Amino acid sequence: MQIRDAIITVTNRTDLSQDDAAAVMEQMMNGEATPAQIAALLTALHFKGETDAEIAGMAQVMRAKSLAVPHDGGVVDTCGTGGDHSNTFNISTTAAFVAAGAGATVAKHGNRAMSSKCGSADVLEGLGVNIELDAEGVARCLRQAGIGFMFAPKFHPAMRYAGPVRREIGIRTIFNVLGPLTNPARAEYQVIGVANAGLAEKLANALSKMGIRRALVVHGSDGLDEISISASTLVFDVRAGATPQASTISPSDFGLSLAPREAIAGGSVEENVAMTKAILEGSDTGPRRDIVLLNAAAALVACERADSFGEALRQAQQAIDTGSANQRMQRMIEASNG
């Protein structure tokens, strides 16, 4: 399908097939579509509403065109789609260190702040991590530290055609949800946080269509794009080719107390760096630690290092209490600057 035909199809509120969405994405990524055509299609998809098949088709192409990171397999990514405007501290980034401390290999894919003051790239840079690594540099971090970071702008050169357009039109587009699905390390396991319940189900179905080995797509009922400490969380358990299974979990299921959203609020880069350090060093034992434990546990379940959330939570607690999580952070800083 040509992009002009796709624009007409979507404007008529007809969905694209996964193959047609992929074909159109190829044209956008290869520079075969004009800026006007890209803007028209993105806007039409926005108002029609993107389907899981459209998301899967476009994500497969975008991921295939990213700069691949070599590794030995079995890596997990933890990230959110953003857009919850919650201004929390960097939960998934801190949880990534804890998951690594518990033995997972974490290939984190992220960017600078979108809906908060401090994104994953910002806090990692503040901690002393070199975020400007190429694929081999990230691979070195994975080998030496068990955790690496792929700064999205460096790994998606094909976005040079669509990137300026999506910024200029100024609305949320399908690209806002493609990021977590396009990990350059081709992560076999994922935890993806989503601020909208309907979108969570779409992403779960898209991941299944893309053949993910296992993923958890989570949505806090308070609107958080993480597993929440302030409310229950909707969890879609995704396995390749299978219908995602939905369930609900609550902090109380694991003996953790509910806490108000203000208790996990973030601040400036410097403040968020201090919060991450306090959790990993073991000096913060309050709600911030608890929400990190829950989200690290999700990563351990997703990458099948634990059979249950309860077991995963114990592994996450041990990773902090033994100093292993903090050690992973220090190793990542060293490896990224090596």
UniProtKB/Swiss-Prot annotation:
Which superkingdom?
Bacteria
Residue positions binding 5-phospho-alpha-D-ribose 1-diphosphate? 80, 83-84, 88, 90-93, 108-116, 120
The protein's role, per its UniProt record: Catalyzes the transfer of the phosphoribosyl group of 5-phosphorylribose-1-pyrophosphate (PRPP) to anthranilate to yield N-(5'-phosphoribosyl)-anthranilate (PRA).
Q: Which residues are listed for Mg(2+) 1 binding in this entry?
A: 92, 226
**Protein name according to UniProt:** Anthranilate phosphoribosyltransferase
Q: Which residues bind Mg(2+) 2?
A: 225-226
The reaction(s) catalysed by this protein are: N-(5-phospho-beta-D-ribosyl)anthranilate + diphosphate = 5-phospho-alpha-D-ribose 1-diphosphate + anthranilate
The entry lists its GO molecular-function terms as: anthranilate phosphoribosyltransferase activity; magnesium ion binding
The pathway it acts in is: Amino-acid biosynthesis; L-tryptophan biosynthesis; L-tryptophan from chorismate: step 2/5
Q: Name its species.
A: Herpetosiphon aurantiacus (strain ATCC 23779 / DSM 785 / 114-95)
Q: PANTHER family given for it?
A: ANTHRANILATE PHOSPHORIBOSYLTRANSFERASE (PTHR43285:SF2)
Q: Which UniProt keywords apply?
A: Amino-acid biosynthesis, Aromatic amino acid biosynthesis, Glycosyltransferase, Magnesium, Metal-binding, Transferase, Tryptophan biosynthesis
Task: Please describe the quaternary structure of this protein.
Answer: Homodimer.
InterPro entries assigned: Anthranilate_Pribosyl_Tfrase, Glycosyl_Trfase_fam3, Glycosyl_Trfase_fam3_N_dom, Glycosyl_Trfase_fam3_N_dom_sf, Nuc_phospho_transferase
Q: Name one GO biological process term.
A: L-tryptophan biosynthetic process
**Chain positions recorded as anthranilate 1 binding sites:** 80, 111
